[in-house]
A protein has these predicted regions:
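Periplasmic c-type cytochrome electron-transfer domains
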Residues: 1-455
Length: 455
């Protein structure tokens, strides 16, 4: 899976091509320890936890939950992939056992809870008998959603307020630290590690050097659930969290089309990178972690774990759509969709052409047009994510409109809360670009939204 030839070709070059990511060598990668996946248990919000639950957890023996040697049928591989999807990467960074049992924490951060009282974005894990850990960093944290009726939809664009909680955690640390200067230095260093592009002048993250903890926390807290920032993006250019339902049909991964998905192996490589292997990346002379750590002290998913996870993601199906496609308004909207030429980019049946469009300010290299499938026309949206992040290819991919009824917020940065707002010309002062549909009559606008919500 992790071989040099495929790694060299599955990503598009960055805008500054010489700064494109160089990933860990196969020799280094396969010396990383395989990440153990332990059996995990649900977390209940205050008022919903069964009596004696924590004492019961403390009596459980550690147990591994993934064993590739037992997997034979398609159903077994897919079920094992769901276990990987649920499994945390780390412990203590985002959650603590006390925090996830604190009513004030839920209220302050507006953490969604399922109808049966679970906080489903993390899990309790027993790695040592008698010690109950709260795991974080699983796929669940970003790619799962508590629906309005309290059901839980795995694979969907998430609605866990992860960045709001990062801001809250920063404020909590600042309130109790005995060394405010050291804390601030560490937080600023973390932002540079996650986001810096020192080959650009000025570095997009340079302003962090003069920001306070309060100011940094405020930026995180302003990022809405459904959007997030993570390694290689930018504190100042978050990205909409992608819906993974239907990912098997997408030619490009990431909003900037960074990764070509030619097979399940490309999806496996992509998951490996975003779930830890990006720590070993080099961008020109810039290393995220310098010096590169001893691989035997770090970990990775096994190829079998990645394959199972890929199979699970490919198996995901959308929930039943409550919006009737034959309703009069939706039928009118279908005609508006066709008349306005929306299907040129959002082409049925996937409602995406699976192509890329250049951002403002990016000149498409001649060899890209045929190699990658480019619509050589900018739609004028904010170019920051495409030009000034470590995922910046100069492009945005054409998103699929399937499943928008259960998703949101919209736009590549999650800057628009609803479809109604997207088609409201008043948004242009705050969210530029993609002017299509902004001159429709109110009736046509309502019809178009009604149709899109049936997809």
């Amino acid at each position: 899976m992790w071989n040099a030839g495929e790694l060299a070709s599955f990503e598009l070059p960055l805008v500054n091509a010489e700064q494109s990511a160089q990933h860990a060598t196969p020799d280094y990668y396969y010396r990383l320890a395989v990440r153990p996946i332990f059996k995990s248990y649900p977390i209940y919000a205050p008022g919903h936890e069964p009596a004696g639950y924590m004492d019961w957890l403390a009596q459980q023996e550690p147990a591994l939950a993934f064993d590739a040697s037992t997997l034979h049928s398609d159903a077994e591989w897919i079920a094992a992939g769901e276990t990987v999807f649920d499994a945390p990467l780390g412990y203590g960074a985002t959650f603590t056992p006390a925090r996830v049992r604190d009513r004030d924490w839920y209220a302050h951060n507006q953490v969604p809870v399922t109808k049966d009282g679970r906080m489903p974005f993390a899990r309790y894990v027993i790695r040592t008998k008698g010690v109950v850990d709260v795991g974080s960093g699983s796929c669940l944290m970003c790619h799962a959603r508590v629906m309005p009726d309290g059901t839980f939809l795995k694979g969907a664009q998430g609605n866990f307020p992860s960045d709001r909680i990062v801001g809250d955690n920063l404020r909590r640390q600042a309130a109790v630290t005995n060394d405010a200067a050291a804390l601030l230095d560490g937080v600023r260093l973390g932002q540079r590690t996650f986001f810096s592009m020192p080959w650009l002048k000025p570095d997009p993250i340079a302003r962090v050097a003069t920001m306070t903890i309060d100011e940094i926390a405020s930026v995180y807290e302003a990022i809405p659930p459904g959007a997030s920032t993570r390694v290689n993006l930018s504190l100042f250019a978050p990205a909409q969290i992608p819906d993974l339902i239907g990912v098997r049909d997408r030619r490009f991964l990431d909003h900037t089309g960074l990764v070509q998905q030619r097979s399940i192996a490309d999806l496996m490589r992509y998951i490996a990178i975003v779930q830890g292997a990006n720590a070993f990346d080099r961008f020109g002379e810039f290393l995220l972690v310098d010096p590169v750590p001893d691989p035997t002290k770090m970990d990775r998913y096994s190829d079998e774990q990645l394959y199972a996870l890929g199979r699970y993601l490919y198996s995901l199906e959308p929930p039943s759509n409550p919006n009737p496609p034959n309703a009069t308004t939706a039928a009118d909207g279908r005609r508006v969709f066709s008349r306005e030429g929306c299907n040129a980019c959002h082409t049925a049946p996937l409602y995406t052409s699976n192509t890329l469009t250049p951002s403002d300010g990016f000149i498409v290299p001649g060899d890209h047009l045929k190699r990658y499938g480019i619509i050589n026309r900018s739609v004028g949206t904010d170019p920051e994510l495409a030009l000034r992040t470590r995922k910046g290819t100069g492009y945005y991919k054409v998103p699929s409109l399937k499943g928008v009824w259960y998703r949101g917020p919209f736009q590549h940065a999650g800057a628009v809360r609803t479809l109604e707002e997207w088609f409201d010309p008043a948004r242009l002062g705050r969210v530029p670009g993609h002017r299509f549909g902004l001159t429709l009559t109110p009736a046509d606008r309502r019809a178009l939204v009604a149709f899109i919500e049936t997809l």
